[in-house]
Amino acid sequence: MLNVNLGPFAVQVSHLLLLASLLVAAGVGHLVGRRQKTGISNVLVDMVLVALLAARMAFVAIWFDVYRSAPWSILDIRDGGFTPWAGLAAALLVAIWRGWRRAALREPLIWGLTAGALAWSVISGAADTLNPRLPTVQLKTLAGEPTDLAAMAKGKPMVVNLWATWCPPCRREMPVLAAAQQQETAVTFVFANQGEGAAVAQRYLSTGELSLANVLLDSGAELGRAIGSTALPTTLFYDANGSLVDTHLGELSTASLASKLKKLRTRADRLTKE
């Protein structure tokens, strides 16, 4: 499962797992600090805010050449462009600084952060074991011929984009994906339209001046159910063995797509050496 619906909003499961880990850290920190009437909730909030800022700044620095042509997009964090190690390092520095300034925080911080880290390791590890392999859902080409994702992959790493013509973020990210399909010839790109017919999809493609290969139809939106995502757009990144390497819910930017393709290439190199 990739996301959970909370009313009209689709929330990524990974974000919920992180929130659960933070709650564990806050709870344990509160219990340990009760004797000194000291909690660590405020410290955790500061750590999260600084971590987000540092992770975004590091990501932008790494992919600055991509952002250079559209600098305003640096502020659009909806593309999911964050560098986790930079955020983690910044968060730990905040914890060390706050503990150094106030001795009463040290024990609650140590126990709370340890508990939170253990909780994250356990629940994220359990979630990783549930990551689905390449779905076997039957799809159709625009010409009406049956096919599936394994047949489309042809032994290559694959990017699968779930989209619909009525979805504004889907339409905005299409030029980015179309350009990547032209450039990344070692990767198979598949565009699985969700819940619409061939005429609707073809009309959009013809009016949008997009040159896309491997556009498939999933009229029953079975692919979304198979991977556990009701959100559009959803993009899946599979290695050549059909194992899920990464996912992205929401609109991709050029930089965020480039970072995920780099991860896919790294996995491909590792599989080649094995």
Task: Give each language-model segment a name.
Residues 172-208, 219-225:
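Structural microenvironment flanking redox-active thiols in thiol-disulfide oxidoreductases
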Residues 206-211, 218-269:
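Thiol/disulfide oxidoreductase modules built on the thioredoxin-like
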Residues 119-151:
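N-terminal "domain-start" segment that seeds a small globular fold
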Residues 148-171, 177:
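Short active-site neighborhood of thiol/selenol oxidoreductases, capturing the structured segment around
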Residues 1-131:
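Hydrophobic, membrane-interfacing alpha helices
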Residues 135, 158, 232-233:
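Short loop/turn microsegments at loop-to-beta-strand junctions
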Residues 159-160, 189, 235:
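Hydrophobic beta-strand anchors of alpha/beta hydrolase catalytic cores
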Residues 1, 271-274:
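Short, solvent-exposed mixed-charge patches
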